[in-house]
């Protein structure tokens, strides 16, 4: 008995140890000669307090390649890249292909640049995603800015409420900043665009990279695996000296980057006959009445809450969607909001169909729920009889009319008496 209790106690301690040691491993790459790490201590300490295990690496301290993998296992969950002028060192330590592989394998990346520090490794990596930061030496200017010494941007230029939803008017200090042009991709998440009166100019040259609100100061990207990237065009944005104006936005931005918020999941996706009979009990056939329902929850950084939306759609597809129906709320509990299609009729076509909910909203994590089921055709004894088809009534009436007429003719022919007539005979004489 004592042995059993000891075994149970060891298992309990091991479980507590595993839960307690689940930290988010983060690699911090910086250039001490360009941007001293002490200037970002407020946000780095905040990450450590939120159970992030930070590993720091000065790119000038080594020229060897940084190991992001142990065989096929990721060694880090996140990477933070501060502005660096040692572009060649960064390229040797983390090549572009390695960054792409890390991002494809669900690793999150936060990178910053400045007009004087735009490493080619980061630039080429961002270009692969459709984000084009301004070249080195290009600075965004706004002569209508409240400050003549640094760029100040209003919260009115925020573009995505799932990243940061300002409850009141705020001003964000960027100092000297770069701006980026964006491709038209659904994975790109525009977060903060430049003021309409701004433009990007090169020092000593008259050419411009962006003009007005076509430039972006903060940009996100979320791949299909829900790994996230954020690029910030200014090295001053996260500095301690600007935390009074930028703190709330910066904290929420870091939470979004590292999947601490705006993460949704789909649960309890079910479909059945309209009377509640499941597919296993009675497989679907064409023109059956069916109901589909699914639930959605959203992680707010502390707990799962019901996700409220009015644009979630259900698709019944074979190759292309046969139906695309907007889901309606049907109920909720403390964690989940449930949605349903209501009753709908399956198409008059048999085959293999996918019951699909693919919800992709910019700023929220992507979630897909699909179930593949076969829809059979009607059996021989399940087709409607001819008299049930209204279009056949004309032909049935014609057939019945012919039969009745024939019977009437036969009866009349048989029962009607014939009149006898005597024939005269003559003998032929020569």
Swiss-Prot record:
<dbReference type="GO" id="GO:0005789">
    <property type="term" value="C:endoplasmic reticulum membrane"/>
</dbReference>
<dbReference type="InterPro" id="IPR055457">
    <property type="entry name" value="OST48_N"/>
</dbReference>
<comment type="similarity">
    <text>Belongs to the DDOST 48 kDa subunit family.</text>
</comment>
<feature type="transmembrane region" description="Helical">
    <location>
        <begin position="394"/>
        <end position="414"/>
    </location>
</feature>
<dbReference type="GO" id="GO:0005635">
    <property type="term" value="C:nuclear envelope"/>
</dbReference>
<dbReference type="GO" id="GO:0008250">
    <property type="term" value="C:oligosaccharyltransferase complex"/>
</dbReference>
<comment type="function">
    <text>Subunit of the oligosaccharyl transferase (OST) complex that catalyzes the initial transfer of a defined glycan (Glc(3)Man(9)GlcNAc(2) in eukaryotes) from the lipid carrier dolichol-pyrophosphate to an asparagine residue within an Asn-X-Ser/Thr consensus motif in nascent polypeptide chains, the first step in protein N-glycosylation. N-glycosylation occurs cotranslationally and the complex associates with the Sec61 complex at the channel-forming translocon complex that mediates protein translocation across the endoplasmic reticulum (ER). All subunits are required for a maximal enzyme activity.</text>
</comment>
<feature type="glycosylation site" description="N-linked (GlcNAc...) asparagine">
    <location>
        <position position="60"/>
    </location>
</feature>
<comment type="subunit">
    <text>Component of the oligosaccharyltransferase (OST) complex, which appears to exist in two assemblies comprising OST1, OST2, OST4, OST5, STT3, SWP1, WPB1, and either OST3 or OST6. OST assembly occurs through the formation of 3 subcomplexes. Subcomplex 1 contains OST1 and OST5, subcomplex 2 contains STT3, OST3, and OST4, and subcomplex 3 contains OST2, WBP1, and SWP1. Interacts with SEC61, SBH1 and SSS1.</text>
</comment>
<comment type="pathway">
    <text>Protein modification; protein glycosylation.</text>
</comment>
<feature type="topological domain" description="Lumenal">
    <location>
        <begin position="24"/>
        <end position="393"/>
    </location>
</feature>
<dbReference type="GO" id="GO:0016757">
    <property type="term" value="F:glycosyltransferase activity"/>
</dbReference>
<dbReference type="InterPro" id="IPR055459">
    <property type="entry name" value="OST48_MD"/>
</dbReference>
<dbReference type="Pfam" id="PF03345">
    <property type="entry name" value="OST48_N"/>
</dbReference>
<dbReference type="GO" id="GO:0005783">
    <property type="term" value="C:endoplasmic reticulum"/>
</dbReference>
<keyword id="KW-0732">Signal</keyword>
<feature type="topological domain" description="Cytoplasmic">
    <location>
        <begin position="415"/>
        <end position="430"/>
    </location>
</feature>
<keyword id="KW-1133">Transmembrane helix</keyword>
<keyword id="KW-0325">Glycoprotein</keyword>
<dbReference type="Pfam" id="PF23358">
    <property type="entry name" value="OST48_MD"/>
</dbReference>
<feature type="glycosylation site" description="N-linked (GlcNAc...) asparagine">
    <location>
        <position position="332"/>
    </location>
</feature>
<keyword id="KW-0812">Transmembrane</keyword>
<dbReference type="GO" id="GO:0018279">
    <property type="term" value="P:protein N-linked glycosylation via asparagine"/>
</dbReference>
<keyword id="KW-0472">Membrane</keyword>
<protein>
    <recommendedName>
        <fullName>Dolichyl-diphosphooligosaccharide--protein glycosyltransferase subunit WBP1</fullName>
    </recommendedName>
</protein>
<dbReference type="InterPro" id="IPR005013">
    <property type="entry name" value="DDOST_48_kDa_subunit"/>
</dbReference>
<feature type="signal peptide">
    <location>
        <begin position="1"/>
        <end position="20"/>
    </location>
</feature>
<keyword id="KW-0256">Endoplasmic reticulum</keyword>
<dbReference type="GO" id="GO:0006487">
    <property type="term" value="P:protein N-linked glycosylation"/>
</dbReference>
